[in-house]
Swiss-Prot record:
Its main location: membrane. InterPro entries: ATP_synth_B-like_membr_sf, ATP_synth_b/b'su_bac/chlpt. It comes from Helicobacter pylori (strain P12). The lineage of its organism: Bacteria, Pseudomonadati, Campylobacterota, Epsilonproteobacteria, Campylobacterales. F-type ATPases have 2 components, F(1) - the catalytic core - and F(0) - the membrane proton channel. F(1) has five subunits: alpha(3), beta(3), gamma(1), delta(1), epsilon(1). F(0) has three main subunits: a(1), b(2) and c(10-14). The alpha and beta chains form an alternating ring which encloses part of the gamma chain. F(1) is attached to F(0) by a central stalk formed by the gamma and epsilon chains, while a peripheral stalk is formed by the delta and b chains. Keywords: ATP synthesis, Cell inner membrane, Cell membrane, CF(0), Hydrogen ion transport, Ion transport, Membrane, Transmembrane, Transmembrane helix, Transport. One of its GO terms (cellular component) is proton-transporting ATP synthase complex. One of its GO terms (molecular function) is proton-transporting ATP synthase activity, rotational mechanism. The keyword Transport applies. It is found in: Cell inner membrane. F(1)F(0) ATP synthase produces ATP from ADP in the presence of a proton or sodium gradient. F-type ATPases consist of two structural domains, F(1) containing the extramembraneous catalytic core and F(0) containing the membrane proton channel, linked together by a central stalk and a peripheral stalk. During catalysis, ATP synthesis in the catalytic domain of F(1) is coupled via a rotary mechanism of the central stalk subunits to proton translocation. Component of the F(0) channel, it forms part of the peripheral stalk, linking F(1) to F(0). This is ATP synthase subunit b. Pfam families: ATP-synt_B (PF00430). The chain crosses the membrane at residues 2-22. The gene is atpF. It is a single-pass membrane protein.
């Protein structure tokens, strides 16, 4: 089949020479063309099987390599899916950890705010109690100093019952 195509192609190439009207009777173009075709046919006969086997082996090598690459691609896609799934799980876990940390921080903040509020209230109560004690102490000292001054002045005379009544009313 190939030889027939080659001969037809050669004849088509020579057709313009025939149409020009040149005298080719003195040339040996036909003999050379036949020798060339014969040479190509013999080469084809001896090399066709080797060429076909070579091309088949190359195509088999290419197909094997393609299959290997496709297998690697499939493994890579599976690994990618697996890693993406792990990434999503890690993101979910991170969000859970963050939300737990926020809740715990809020709880701790509330606890310390409550404790601080209670401490402040206790300090205020203690301060008021200390102030009340100091006021009573100052009143008592003032009353004692006034009574002491009055007793020492001897202008006013008090008995013990009068002192007790006055102290009860003022303190």
């Amino acid at each position: 089949m190939f030889v027939v195509k080659m001969v037809l192609g050669f004849l088509i190439l020579l057709s313009p020479l025939c149409a020009t009207g040149l005298d080719i009777s003195q040339t040996d173009i036909i003999e050379r063309s036949l020798n060339f075709l014969l040479f190509v046919g013999i080469l084809w006969y001896f090399l066709a099987k080797k060429l076909r086997s070579f091309l088949r082996s190359k195509s088999l090598e290419i197909s094997k390599r393609l299959e290997e690459i496709q297998a690697q691609l499939k493994v890579s896609k599976e690994n990618k899916k697996k890693l993406l799934k792990e990434l999503e799980q890690a993101k979910e876990k991170a969000e859970l950890i963050i939300s737990d940390a926020n809740k715990e921080a809020y709880t701790i903040t509330q606890k310390y705010e409550l404790q601080t509020k209670m401490d402040v209230e206790n300090l205020i109560k203690n301060s008021k109690a200390l102030m009340d004690l100091e006021v009573k102490k100052i009143k008592r000292e003032l009353v004692e100093s006034v009574f002491k001054d009055l007793r020492e002045s001897k202008k006013v005379s008090f008995n013990a019952q009068d002192c007790v009544n006055i102290l009860k009313q003022r303190l």
